[in-house]
């Protein structure tokens, strides 16, 4: 949902932004896209790249993420999506209080710093890419807990951090626009 909210907010600020749906729910929301988990593994990167090329006339492409690089069941799709879309920047999504990989109770989620580095490393295979913000899912946290965790993440990573539903997407939108401006200068 982060990418949907960011797309909406970017368009409201006058940017020509396209949400690229990569899963069934995203397709229902957007009306188009490709359900990457239904594509044969060898072709997922190409399917992602095709969507980027089809919509490259937009100023900003907001590509829906899939799974997690640290989830053994879904990391193949996640990695293929990263390699196929060649992102310029990433918004890392994180849920407060989730300590185990969903559906694999014996597998702990690594520290967020490790996940961030892993995403940046694997997204930078073809072109440089970095995490430019963190989207926090604080649905299981009290407002005070969410505020404290957001502040902790800002201090630890020096990045914009927001729960797009609790805080609004503004801080993350600013990070995207800053990256866009920097890329236009380069």
Residue spans of the language-model regions?
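Flexible phosphate-sensing "switch/lid" loops adjacent to ATP/NTP-binding sites
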Residues: 1-186
């Amino acid at each position: 949902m982060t990418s949907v909210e960011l797309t909406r907010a970017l368009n409201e600020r006058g940017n020509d932004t396209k949400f690229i749906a990569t899963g069934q729910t995203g397709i229902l929301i957007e009306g188009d896209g490709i359900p990457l988990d239904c594509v044969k593994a060898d072709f997922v990167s190409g399917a992602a790249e095709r969507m980027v090329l089809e919509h490259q006339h937009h100023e900003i492409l907001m590509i829906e993420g899939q799974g997690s690089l640290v989830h053994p069941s879904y990391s193949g799709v996640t990695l293929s999506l990263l390699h196929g879309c060649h992102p310029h920047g990433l918004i890392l999504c994180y849920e407060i209080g989730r300590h185990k990989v969903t559906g694999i109770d014996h597998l702990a989620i690594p520290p967020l710093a490790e996940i961030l580095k892993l995403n940046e490393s694997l997204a930078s295979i073809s072109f440089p890419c970095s995490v430019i913000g963190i989207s926090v899912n604080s649905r299981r946290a009290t407002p005070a807990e969410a505020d404290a965790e957001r502040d902790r993440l800002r201090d630890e990573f020096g990045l914009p951090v927001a729960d797009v539903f609790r805080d609004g997407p503004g801080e993350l939108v600013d990070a995207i626009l800053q990256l866009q401006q920097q890329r236009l200068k380069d």
